[in-house]
Amino acid sequence: MSIKYVATSKLPTPWGVFAMHGFEDTETGKEHVALTFGSLSSDEPVLGRIHSECLTGDALFSLRCDCGFQLQTAMQNIAETGSGFILYLRQEGRGIGLLNKIRAYELQDKGANTVEANEQLGFPADMRKYDMIQPMLEKIGVKHVRLMTNNPRKVKAMKEIGIEVVERVPLQVGKNRYNEAYLKTKSTELGHMMSEYHFTDEE
């Protein structure tokens, strides 16, 4: 995989001004973004998140998932901490793409869970890859991470490229009546580390 750094700009947000670093995968043409806030240290653990693109949750405020809630909470946590990063990866629908995600939602409307829907369409439950994160983290100067995630695959991906995950920070937000079954499936079938104790509900 060939990841090329492109440019950096300011990104004003409700939580403060982030820096937005653009990257291009020259093999696939996909574009990825790293958001950074404050001064990042290569020696100290940095609060961060790997976030896969979710148009429906991040931009369209869908309650079918917890993605948008996680993104906003991660940005808020980073701003309150004073520094941190988010790697925003263009892997819509756990890697199956937007239109296939809508097809999967149609199957879920008929009773399939999120894993079954992907498999009925001929896809694995999770197609995401994380090999692009190494050059992105190298560019922003991060070697030790306090990782905001419930997904053990992301912790493993960090460790495999030599990034020390000093702490896994649970990010359980946004549970509501529309996504309760989805969250349960992520826990029971995809191995996400979640507990009722950590959940923040949304009405």
Curated annotation (Swiss-Prot):
Q: Cellular component per GO?
A: cytosol
| Residues the entry annotates as binding Zn(2+) | 54, 65, 67
- EC number of the protein: 3.5.4.25
- Alphabetically list the UniProt keywords: GTP-binding, Hydrolase, Metal-binding, Nucleotide-binding, Riboflavin biosynthesis, Zinc
According to the record, cofactor stoichiometry and binding are noted as: Binds 1 zinc ion per subunit.
Positions annotated as active site in the UniProt record = 126 (proton acceptor), 128 (nucleophile)
Q: Which domain of life is it from?
A: Bacteria
Q: Which pathway does the record list?
A: Cofactor biosynthesis; riboflavin biosynthesis; 5-amino-6-(D-ribitylamino)uracil from GTP: step 1/4
* Keyword Metal-binding carried by entry: yes
Q: Can you state which reaction this protein catalyses?
A: GTP + 4 H2O = 2,5-diamino-6-hydroxy-4-(5-phosphoribosylamino)-pyrimidine + formate + 2 phosphate + 3 H(+)
Q: Name one GO biological process term.
A: riboflavin biosynthetic process
Known cofactor(s) = Zn(2+)
List ligand-binding residues for GTP. 49-53, 70, 92-94, 114, 149, 154
- InterPro entries in UniProt: GTP_cyclohydro_II, RibA, RibA-like_sf
Entry's Gene Ontology molecular function annotations: GTP binding; GTP cyclohydrolase II activity; zinc ion binding
Under the heading Pfam families, the entry gives:
GTP_cyclohydro2
SUPFAM superfamilies on file: RibA-like (SSF142695)
Under the heading PANTHER family, the entry gives: 3,4-DIHYDROXY-2-BUTANONE 4-PHOSPHATE SYNTHASE (PTHR21327:SF18), GTP CYCLOHYDROLASE II-RELATED (PTHR21327)
Of which family is this protein a member?
Answer: Belongs to the GTP cyclohydrolase II family.
Per the entry, what this protein does is:
Catalyzes the conversion of GTP to 2,5-diamino-6-ribosylamino-4(3H)-pyrimidinone 5'-phosphate (DARP), formate and pyrophosphate.
Instruction: State what protein this is by name.
Output: GTP cyclohydrolase-2
